[in-house]
Each structure stands twice: as C-alpha cells, then as structure tokens.
Regions:
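C-terminal helical cap/extension that packs against the catalytic core
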Residues: 54, 400-464
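Conserved N-terminal Rossmann-fold NAD(P)-binding element of oxidoreductases
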Residues: 13-18, 471
C-alpha cells in the first residue's frame, strides 16, 4: 500500500472512545488509508487534540449520545472492550442496523495489510514496541506503528505512511485480541496473570500466549526463560530443556540475546525462526544503562534493568526484520521513553523532578521504582492510583510491598474504569495504603483518596532533588501535570 493508493476509501468509521491511546491510533490509521472517520469521548485528551490538529477528526466531547453517530447506513461503529454494550452510541448502531466492530477486529484488518511485528507480554509492550519503531526507523525501514503511547520526541502513538514493509503493534491479552492478529514476527516479553476477569488461571493465560506464538510466520523473539520457552510451538518431538529448545540435532540457543535461531514449525504450514533473548547484568547508570548485544555496546537513556531487557527484545525483532545491527542500536541512543512510560514531565516549584508512568501491576511498580532509584539524589516519592477494583482486591499486598521501596508512598483511591464499586464491596485504595504501611515498617505512607486531596499535600511535600513518580493507568497523569511549573515539552 503506497500513496496514493488508499484501500479504505469509501468506508465510514465512527470510533467510540476515540480519546484513548489505542482507539486514537486506529482512527489515525483508518484516515491514512482513505476512510472517513469520526469519533467521540467523554473527555478531551492529548490524543483528541492531536487528531484535530492533524486534520484527522474533531471528536465530539461529552457524555456519549446517539446523536454522535453520523447519518448513513454504511457507518461502522468501532468500540473497545472498555465500551459496554449499553453505551448509547452502540445502542443506536444496533437500532439502525449498523455494523458494530470491536477494536480487535479492526486491528486484525490492519495487520493483514502489512508484515506485522506484534509485541506481547504482561509488562513492557509499549516501551518495547516504541523502541522497535525507533530501531526500524534508524535502519531506514520506514515502519508504520500502532502503540499504546507516543514512541518518542515529536512522534505520536500511531504512524501510517504506507511507504514501508513493516507494521509494529502491541498484542493485547486483556481481551484476547492478540489471537486475531496476522503476525509475521511475534515478541513475548513475559507472562504474569494480570487480567483476572479474562483468565481464570495462570495456565489459561499461558495457553493463550502459546496460541499467539503459533500465529507467527517468520520469527519468534522470546525472553530466555524456561517457562516462556515452554510456550514456543515446535514440530512434534521437540523438547524444551532449560534455556534451549532441542529440535532433532539442532538447538535454539539461549544465552543472553545471542540465540542463533533454528527453523521449527510455528503453526500449520509455517516456519518461524526462534530467538531467545536476555540482557544479563546491565551496567546501570544515572538514568540509563550499558550492556553488550551481539558484540555491540548498547547505551540507553532510560533507567532500569527492565529497559535493557526491553531494548534487547526490540533489537532482536529489528534484526529479524532486516535491520542492520549498528543502525538499529543507534536508533535507541536517543530514546528517552514512550509516552506515560517513566516520562519526565518537568519540575515542581521546588525543583523536584516529576515523572508519569503507566504502571498498574505490582511487578511494573517495582521495576519503575527500581529505575527511579538510580535518579533520586534526595527522596523517591511514589504516587499510585490503583486501576480496577478486582486487581486491587487480588494484589493489594503485592502493591504495598512494591510501594514500600520508595521513601514516601502516596496512595489514591481506585480508578474504576469499566468496573462498579457496588460490585466490589469493601475494596478501595485504602487496602493498598495499609499494605504499604505494613511493609514500610514506619516509613511514611499517605492515604489521599482523590486527586484534589493529593495535589496540595504533594506540592507542599516536594523538595529540591526529589524524584516524584506518579503511577497508574487511570487519570492520575492529570495530577502529575499539576505538580510541575516548568515542563519538559511532554
């Protein structure tokens, strides 16, 4: 698909919830492919502002209403898993006999138009995807992308020029949409139960990731851990032994991102090269790291050992896609993080640095704070807004333990998203605050339920040299932005 070819010309797509990171990207891609697009959301966002500025669409902002759905019998109404069936715009679509399209279905269509690299895993999808985009761009491969956050300075969460061969997407397990994608290269970063409403057990989750990997036609990039390598599909008789998968006389080598790869079956009638990766003992610096990959030194400007792992996964996927290794590495040198992934927003009035992060699982909170600790010359202050009552109830103790690693922890009430408080009696952010206080053994923990409660306390609390990390998948980024007086252009 190269300009001026626009295969979706004549289609009319209406996006319900277009202000989100995912849906706004699909609207942008559909517009680039020639479709007429419209959208609505309850609140304006940076994404609706960018869509308007770029001439893609002017979203209707406010309560969802049937009047938002354009006239015409050919309109397709696209919705995400966060939009319930009783949403007025979905109800109107059904009453008018319009086509209702789940977000996952549209993404599957998009992946059929390109050779697709799909990044899956419980943690690290957005950062790994953003790094991969930067590596492919630096190598001259002109990728398109649909990512859950901006991929870097001056770049958006989605880009679709139609001039390159590759599309980079996140493969979301929360609604099993990863199982509908057309995948050439699959990346699997890790597996941990997070979406309890979708998966009843870890074994059920693992089977879903196994099915995802079976969709890969060209390559599988997987963290070199036995429990993940065990999910890699292979011909009958293949055996997973420790960190190496044995296929006849050949091995898929483990060993820290140096996997040589071997041809094994990965789905009916397909073959994929399997590449395990790792990044052992990166040298952590003030806000970055150094490590060696395939004989090259890699320098990152994002903190934490987890980001060295993300970068290694991205580099291996880029290599499989045809990128020259040194050019791909150069593309990561100037990467300072994806949007809402340890994103420096600016400084407070007293000179504290304020970061925004999407962490909403204990493992993510712990990794984010470990990375932030390398930057904190004074106190590390963690501000956390839990996301979903169900997750809070299941993981309160684990969240508390992670937050206790900060010098000061501030816990807000739950951002409910699609859940209702009455369905989860007795569950609030206070459960996490109490768990953090127990784990902190006397360290300061604040329970400040609302953004309005937290703002004045934090403004008074922050001091020069502090690092304040505001975490959560809800609207807590609004609080983070109110804490700064000089921004970082974010």
């Amino acid at each position: 698909v190269t300009p001026p070819e626009r295969p979706w010309r004549g289609r009319r797509l209406h996006f319900v919830g277009v202000g989100g990171a995912g849906m706004s990207g699909y609207a942008r891609a559909a517009h680039a492919l020639g479709a007429q697009v419209s959208g609505s959301d309850r609140a304006a966002s940076v994404y609706t502002e960018r869509l308007a500025a770029d001439g893609v669409l002017n979203a209707r902002i406010g309560e969802h209403d049937k009047a938002n759905v354009p006239d015409g019998e050919e309109v397709e109404v696209v919705y995400s898993s966060a939009i319930p069936a009783e949403n007025p715009e979905r109800v109107a679509a059904r009453a008018r006999g319009l086509s209702e399209r789940p977000r996952a279905e549209l993404l599957a269509e998009l992946t059929a138009l390109r050779r697709t690299i799909a990044v899956a895993g419980t943690h690290g999808k957005t950062t790994t995807s953003a790094m991969l985009v930067r590596a492919l761009e630096a190598a001259g491969l002109r990728p398109d992308w649909l990512v859950g956050g901006s991929v870097g300075e001056g770049q958006d969460n989605a880009g679709w020029t139609g001039t390159g061969e590759w599309l980079v997407v996140e493969a979301d397990e929360s609604d099993r949409s990863m199982l509908s994608l057309h995948v050439d290269i699959a990346v699997l970063t890790n597996v941990e139960l997070d979406h309890h409403a979708t998966f009843g057990s870890v074994s059920e989750l693992r089977e879903a990731f196994r099915a995802f990997l079976e969709r890969a036609r060209t390559g599988i990039v997987v963290w070199d851990r036995p429990e993940l390598l065990a999910l890699v599909p292979a011909r009958a008789g293949a055996e997973v032994v420790g960190g190496a998968e044995v296929v006849g006389e050949a091995e898929v080598e483990g060993g820290f991102g140096v996997g040589a790869g071997v041809e094994v079956g990965a789905g009916a009638g397909t073959e994929a090269q399997i590449v395990p990766y790792d990044a052992p003992a990166p040298a952590l610096t003030d806000g970055g790291s150094y490590f060696t990959w395939r004989g090259h030194e890699v320098a990152l400007s994002v903190p934490g050992a987890h980001n060295a792992l993300n970068a290694t996964a991205a580099l291996e996927a880029a290599r499989l896609a045809g990128a020259e290794e040194d050019r791909a590495i150069a593309g990561l040198a100037g990467f300072h993080g994806a949007g809402r992934r340890f994103q420096l927003l600016g400084e407070s009035a007293c000179g504290a640095r304020v970061y925004d992060d999407y962490a909403h699982h204990p493992t993510e909170v712990a990794a984010t704070l470990a990375g932030a600790r390398t930057l904190a010359h004074e106190r590390l202050i963690a501000v956390f807004q839990p996301h979903l009552y169900s997750r809070t109830a299941m993981l309160a103790r684990e969240f508390g333990a992670a937050l206790a690693e900060a010098d000061v922890a501030v816990v807000l009430d739950v951002y409910p998203a699609r859940e209702l408080a009455e369905d989860h009696p007795g569950v609030s952010g206070l459960l996490i605050a109490q768990a953090a206080a127990d784990a902190a053994e006397g360290g300061p923990v604040y329970w400040l339920p609302t953004l309005a409660d937290a703002e004045p306390v934090l403004i008074d609390m922050l001091g020069a040299g502090d690092v304040c990390v505001v975490m959560g998948a809800g609207d807590v980024d609004l609080l983070a932005r109110k804490l700064i007086v000089s921004d970082n252009g974010a």
